[in-house]
């Protein structure tokens, strides 16, 4: 009797801890089968960021979910995921003392996401998603590679992973 009481007392706190199995705490109702993901809107003065974020999000949804993903707004979709790039900043992070120029930069992107059902009901909303990525610059013009594009792609991948996880797992 003592052992069963002790076991019960030890297991009781676990019942209310919020633990759940994968996919059981989703913001997305079970009747949603098709998600539309139109190209994200951008309010930033940056080239191609909205495309990188849209493509990364579609790739992540295709990889991690069973939903049929449409890459455009469609009345046939059960829900639509709209994203907006709110800002994109690039700031010098480190300086090269010999050249007097920046040797690495920090790119910061702020975005928001809104998932709405076909009837207009909000299923998921996050108005402040912030991601940072560092990249190196070079003063060698012969070997110059535009590193900021690679940094944006890494930020987009991290953003998509976090967004899909938040939508699916409610963490």
Enumerate the predicted regions with their spans.
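A structural "domain/chain start" motif
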Residues: 17-66, 119, 139-141, 161, ...
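Short, glycine-/polar-rich solvent-exposed loops and beta-turns at beta-strand/coil boundaries
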Residues: 28-29, 72-77
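Surface-exposed short loop/turn segments
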Residues: 65-67, 75-126, 133-150
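A short, local hydrophobic-aromatic micro-motif
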Residues: 33, 38, 70, 81-82, ...
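Sec-dependent bacterial lipoprotein signal peptides
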Residues: 1-17
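Soluble non-cytosolic domains of exported or imported proteins
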Residues: 44-55, 102-106, 146-158
């Amino acid at each position: 009797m003592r052992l069963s009481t002790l076991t019960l007392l030890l297991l009781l706190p676990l019942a209310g801890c919020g633990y759940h199995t994968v996919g059981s705490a989703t913001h997305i109702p079970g009747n949603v089968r098709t998600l539309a993901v139109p190209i994200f809107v951008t309010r930033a003065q940056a080239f191609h960021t909205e495309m990188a974020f849209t493509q990364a999000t579609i790739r992540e949804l295709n990889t991690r979910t069973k939903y049929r993903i449409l890459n455009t707004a469609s009345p046939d979709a059960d829900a639509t995921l709209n994203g907006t790039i709110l800002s994109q900043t690039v700031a010098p992070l480190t300086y090269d003392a010999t050249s007097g120029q920046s040797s690495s930069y920090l790119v910061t992107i702020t975005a928001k996401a809104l998932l709405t059902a076909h009837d207009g009901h909000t299923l998921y909303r996050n108005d402040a998603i912030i991601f940072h990525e560092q990249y190196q610059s070079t003063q060698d013009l012969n070997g110059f590679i535009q590193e900021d594009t690679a940094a944006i792609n890494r930020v987009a991948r991290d953003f998509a992973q976090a967004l899909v996880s938040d939508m699916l797992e409610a963490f």
